[in-house]
Amino acid sequence: MIILKKQHDTIIVLDFGSQYNQLIARRIREFGVYSELHPHTITAEEIKAMNPKGIIFSGGPNSVYGEGALHCDEKIFDLGLPIFGICYGMQLMTQQFGGTVERANHREYGKAVLKVENESKLYANLPEEQVVWMSHGDLVTGLPEGFVVDATSESCPIAGMSNEAKNLYGVQFHPEVRHSEHGNDLIKNFVFGVCGCSEGWNMENFIEVELEKIRETVGDKKVLCALSGGVDSSVVAVLIHKAIGDQLTCIFVDHGLLRKGEAEGVMKTFSEGFHMNVIKVDAKERFMNKLKGVEDPEQKRKIIGNEFIYVFDDEASKLEGMDFLAQGTLYTDIVESGTATAQTIKSHHNVGGLPEDMQFKLIEPLNTLFKDEVRVLGSELGIPDEIVWRQPFPGPGLGIRVLGEITEEKLEIVRESDAILREEIIKAGLDREIWQYFTALPGMRSVGVMGDERTYDYTVGIRAVTSIDGMTADWARIPWDVLEKISVRIVNEVKHVNRIVYDVTSKPPATIEWE
């Protein structure tokens, strides 16, 4: 984790396993205040050495009274710092100070109406009623001594509490999730109103610190960069190239799972445009042989991740002195793969598929950033908009957009349909409004009629979502006439397709990718 210069105010977030914990840090950074996520096992002395302005306890999937419950160093409460407990964090604080936590009659998940009963600093200038996002199975049923009820909801009589004399605050809901309509304001009240932070964190600070960190880590050694042409790997390549110049060699692996025209575009942009040393490896046959007959999505991801590293290993053996491998791993990649405390949603290609005998040391300069921060970073580095605003594309590529076994025919269907979708979205001027859009092949066939003949062909799914950081997302309301054009074109122009469906599921409960 990057430690910035002492003049920057910092809020520490302790990780108790919530899938939303990175969002807390993200929200705080949006306010211009630096925030770091640390494991709940961090000691009070370690926190004191960081000189933070305040601490936030994240939520988590455990019960504070259950076996294996996660706790923190009790001396943290003696530091005299403001503490804000969210969900599990509030329950932990309650238990620590002698209150009561019990299992709820039923798990509460979704939107709820919060009623503010006591206007503590946390609720300053906020409406008395507001919609919040609940996700919990336990409740605080008895307040600790010195605490008062700040807020209630229909199913949660103690939805918020505080002990303002000690600057201790807790909420049962998740203000960091955008479904909580005044969540940002509530966190802002803690950061500025309670902790007294000042703005000072920005991407220029990040670049300054990260360049220094890369140079210090690499020294006179050489780095291989896994270049795909997507936003993340492009920013990594340019950032590292800025730090160490020709000590960087980019390897572009064409695994046969790329979008239409992608391979040619990558070579033109980085080899010719940025004057980087880019080695292209044609590994289509190698990947397809490994993936033959494989249907399980987790197995596919790990095979693709392993093969990537082995390809790099093979290429590195042909080069001299390659010690480091650079990857575009983001905060969101890590949280979706599960931390020591978070439950795994799915293994990520940058963090879940690495072989144990890997010969490289990893450099992941973006692993403290969210996608929108990466785009800002890319712009600061002078990367053209067409790359900075390129569609997010997973490392396994079309391999996880073909559900089940991958074949050349299925890949071609996804590749061509995706190209049509992207073309029409850009034509409609929606490419900056929609966070991510792509087609997927669920593998099911259905009956249709084309040219007075019966067909039995594939269904193509369209996925398009709006989001800020990829941690939560809503399905995009694409105009019907645009959807109609996309549907007509795909059915008419892509062989073996006779039906189009549109995914209208948000995240959560679904993830953005289908596998």
From Swiss-Prot:
EC class name: ligase
Molecular-function GO term, any one: GMP synthase activity
Keywords: ATP-binding, Glutamine amidotransferase, GMP biosynthesis, Ligase, Nucleotide-binding, Purine biosynthesis
Residues binding ATP: S228, G229, G230, V231, D232, S233, S234
Residues annotated as domain Glutamine amidotransferase type-1: 10-200
Family matches, as InterPro entries: Class_I_gatase-like (IPR029062), GATASE (IPR017926), GMP_synth_C (IPR001674), GMP_synth_GATase (IPR004739), GMP_synthase (IPR022955), GMPS_ATP_PPase_dom (IPR025777), NAD/GMP_synthase (IPR022310), Rossmann-like_a/b/a_fold (IPR014729)
Entry's Gene Ontology cellular component terms: cytosol
Disulfide bridges in this chain: none
Pfam families: GATase (PF00117), GMP_synt_C (PF00958), NAD_synthase (PF02540)
Start and end residues of each GMPS ATP-PPase domain: 201-390
Signal recorded as keyword: no
Pathway: Purine metabolism; GMP biosynthesis; GMP from XMP (L-Gln route): step 1/1
Documented EC number(s): 6.3.5.2
Positions of the catalytic residues: C87 (nucleophile), H174, E176
Keyword Signal found: no
Catalyzed reaction equations: XMP + L-glutamine + ATP + H2O = GMP + L-glutamate + AMP + diphosphate + 2 H(+)
Self-association state and partner proteins as the record states: Homodimer.
Matching NCBIfam families: guaA_Cterm, guaA_Nterm, PRK00074.1
Role according to the record: Catalyzes the synthesis of GMP from XMP.
Name under which the protein is recorded: GMP synthase [glutamine-hydrolyzing]
Underlying gene: guaA
